[in-house]
Design a protein with these regions (language model features):
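C-terminal structural segment of proteins
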Residues: 1-347
């Protein structure tokens, strides 16, 4: 780990001021970083993948509340920990898909530290990104992509480019994508802007090192959730081991039905894309069906119409089809509600 300066911000404006003043005098590789929980950033610093000359501590900023919005949704502070968010009674009752996604990730200790804003910004877990002696366009632009000719069975098959095939690792972000969350960002000029999560992440294309729409001096302050969705909420995650592992494939789902007919379907996927993935065309295919094998097969074929698979990754298409069939059939056996988590489920 390289030597760095540490400064604690007293307010959002103070944090942005420190950041913009420092960035104006530093090279890209030396830029300062905001740090909240630090559960991903500190690992990257230990491996010298990130080498900030300054850390700006924002963990004590007053961004740790969860409040109702006038529209009937929720406004979540960026400093709310993953554990706090998963344990919140409204999240458990009305946004159970989000609570389930949060509880499927990391360990209780990490969830206690990880912030909501930071979770959205965590970096890929591609093997080659974490190996400084391997080429990686995401870590070092124009150095090449070691994963394409190497081991990539856990990487993306949608939204990739010749430059990068890394997946986005966040479970929470998959649920946020399904819920159409909105990211509130304070800018260096003091203004705020709201960005739908569908527009927050950038595809790798020719610049895989640029992962979001954040600009110099931008700071995530809140995440807004729309009003709750009716239906059966679920989050299913297939991984190499039962705990503390990233998804090979994950599916966030909210499914509403009338007897044996699907009347509303929302789906978002993790482990298959360069960002949390949603395709509304497959939802339209399933709505009005009974979730039969033919409808599921057509939906999955539509989802993977532009997928880039090979002998290492083609299993993901089969895995998604089987998992989606299981999710739909399970939902049809449950009443139309948000499938709230019981108080006995630990965050």
């Amino acid at each position: 780990m390289k030597i760095f300066d540490y400064q604690r911000a007293n307010s959002v404006d103070d944090a942005i001021k420190i950041d913009t003043l420092a960035e104006g005098n530093l090279a890209e590789a030396q830029r300062p970083f905001f740090i909240a929980g630090g559960t991903n950033l500190l690992d990257l610093m230990k491996l010298e993948i990130e080498q900030p000359t300054q850390l700006i501590d924002i963990s004590r900023l007053p961004l740790n509340t969860i409040e109702a919005t006038p529209e009937g949704g929720l406004k979540i502070g960026a400093m709310v920990s993953n554990s706090e968010l998963a344990a919140h009674p409204v999240i458990r009752q009305d946004y159970a898909v989000l609570a389930r996604a949060l509880l499927s990730g990391a360990s209780p200790q990490l969830r206690n530290k990880a912030s909501t804003g930071g979770n959205l910004l965590q970096r890929t877990r591609c093997y080659y990104f974490y190996q400084p002696d391997s080429p990686c366009n995401k870590r070092e632009p124009n150095s090449g992509c070691g994963a394409k000719a190497g081991l990539h069975q856990n990487l993306a098959i949608l939204g990739t480019s010749e430059q990068c095939i890394a997946t986005h690792p966040s479970d929470m972000a998959v649920a946020m994508r399904l819920l159409d969350a909105v990211i509130v960002i304070q800018q260096a000029d003091g203004q705020t802007r709201q960005v739908p999560i569908a527009e927050f992440y950038r595809l790798p294309e020719q610049t895989p090192h640029i992962e979001t729409c954040l600009n110099l001096g931008d700071l995530i302050t809140h995440i807004i959730l729309p009003p709750p969705l009716k239906g059966v909420h679920s989050y299913d995650k297939v991984r190499d081991r039962a705990s503390y592992a990233f998804a090979l494939v994950s599916v966030a789902a909210v499914i509403e039905h009338d007897n044996d007919t699907l009347t509303n379907v929302r789906l978002a996927f993790g482990g298959i894309g360069s960002q949390p993935w949603r395709n509304t065309d497959i939802e339209k295919i399933l709505i009005g069906s009974t979730g039969d094998a033919v409808s599921i097969e057509l939906a999955v074929a539509t989802l993977f119409k532009e997928a880039k698979t090979d002998e290492q990754t083609e299993y993901k298409t089969v895995l998604v089809q089987r998992l989606l069939h299981h999710i739909v059939q399970r939902a049809l056996q449950q009443p139309n509600q948000s499938s709230p988590l019981s108080s006995g489920v630990s965050a």
